[in-house]
Amino acid sequence: MNNSTHYTRLHHLGDASKATLFLQVEWLRSAWRRIGLVFFLTSYLAIQHVYALQGANGAHDPSTIVKSGNVYWIFTTGDGIYGMYSTDLVSWTPGPKPVFAIGTWPSWINAKVPGFAGNFWAPECKFMNGKYYLYYSCSTFGSRVSAIGLATNVTLDPASPNYKWEDQGEVVSTNASSTVNAIDPALFEDADGKLWLTYGSFFGGIRATQLDKLTGKPLDLATQYALANGGVEASYIIRNGSYYYLFINRGACCQGVNSTYNVQVGRSASPTGPYLDKNGVSLNSGGGTSVLATSGHYIGPGQVGFYQENGVTYVSHHYYEGFENGAPKLSLANLQWDAAQWPVLTRDWVGAGRYEITSRNSGKVWDAWGCTGVAGQAIAQGNKASLTCQQWDFTSVGNGEYKITNALGGLAAEVASCSPYLAAKLQLNAYSGLLCQQFKIERANDGSYVFASINGNRVVEVPGASQTAGVQLGLWDYNGCTCQRWTLGSAIVTANTAQKLPELAIYPSPVTQGKFTVDLGNLTLTGQVRVEVLNGQGQLVYQQQFNPKPQVEVTVDKPLAAGMYLVHLSSNSGLLTKKIVVQ
């Protein structure tokens, strides 16, 4: 994060008004580091809900995700160095204790950063040599006197008897006469396996220096490379193919809904630069191609980190939540690459298209129950039958949020009565852009997805983890149940396409006493015709074959228990289907 060392430089230029403005901005930055964690903890304790990608999601300056055993960790700005963890990359929980006990810190910091009060900034963590190397920033408001330190631990599990943070002292420090500012550390390895540290802020820009891979400290601080200048900070470098990509932040940080922070990128064939944007402008000359900026209620994103697992790259970053008066939040975006090998950062995890949505718990699919495609129809889980009413069209409305419409009739999935409350049900309705008709989709570590209603952020689940077909989907607080996880498959309707059949009548409706009649009407049927009745578990409970002519109706006389049933009418002409309710 910025440090107001730039204030002195502006006064030397004789521009006191700019200096005062910069100092005010720096006060906001420093203050936000202190109040952000307090705001988050207060909100978390007051709400007492666990939400999809959220849970304890208050975060500022998050580190790269690092994994210890089966648990994912992120460290953020805060007193003592605040940590948060997740087992699925969806729900996050505060760590039980900070790296350093609140109110304490390594004694060497007092000499390097007089006035330091224990609020550490923008940490970064990397696993190497059998232990975790945690880099942290120490600074104070209104000063360019700063330092980056290092602590190590063999495990991130606080319950382990081997859990112990050991401080390794200073990595790099700066003083009032320095031309760079020692904050915002980040690490990367080049193609030759060399380890590098990038750091710096608005004052002096971004620098890179090589580290000893065993100690994690600089090989030669006298050898440094200037990578970016002109109001930059929060650097991070990754390698893809033959290029290195330097991500930076420009704009105003730490001002809540008024933040203009945005992530930019340049690339180079060498780890030491020069880094050029898409237009060929050097990041040392103010260049930078924007890849993540304010969009909707996601305001001022910054401090990116990249974590790859199972072929997917998660981009950790913070943003200011417009729906919550600018509270800082953690978000995970998705890294993709365009045809010219430039990075694309998006919160969209699902491409536009038609999908079948399958429960990880029951194996059943989202189903517009009744297959009529009318407003108010329940969205339930049903046995997979390749029906049109089991196909769903996904359309991104931005920021990982989607409109989901049924292939039969085009009506949208919505939360009934736009309720944000527990147990609210899903149904079909005409899309009008309401928040209760939009769903935020997050990707869990196992490749499944979580659907959260934008209106209240509760997630879609099969109530009670039911295995029964016909159970209407509803909302609940996220708890990690497989009944809240969904997989997406390409929507493939069988060759004998199931369809809405207004000409196929079944009466009476609802069916009583297990007897009903199928009216063949003016259907064109060829070959042998088969009528099948399947129960809610997909089991065949009745079948009959007949020649279509001269027969114009079929009577099914079978004692059926109360419930929902699927009637199939098949012939050489195709497959027709309809759901019935037996009372």
What is the predicted role of each segment?
Residues I35-Q48:
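Bacterial N-terminal signal peptides
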Residues Y85, L187-F188, S268, Q336, ...:
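Hydrophobic beta-strand positions
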Residues T87-V90, V154-L156, L214, A269-P271, ...:
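Solvent-exposed strand-loop boundary residues in beta-sheet-rich modules
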Residues T76, Y199-S201, S359, G370, ...:
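Non-cytosolic beta-sheet module surface loops
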Residues M1, Y51-R354, Q391-D393, Q438:
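Carbohydrate-active catalytic/glycan-binding domains of CAZyme proteins
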Residues H11-D15, A19-F22, E26, Q499-Q583:
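C-terminal outer-membrane/trafficking sorting elements
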Residues G351-V493:
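Lectin-like carbohydrate-binding module/patch detector with strong preference for beta-trefoil
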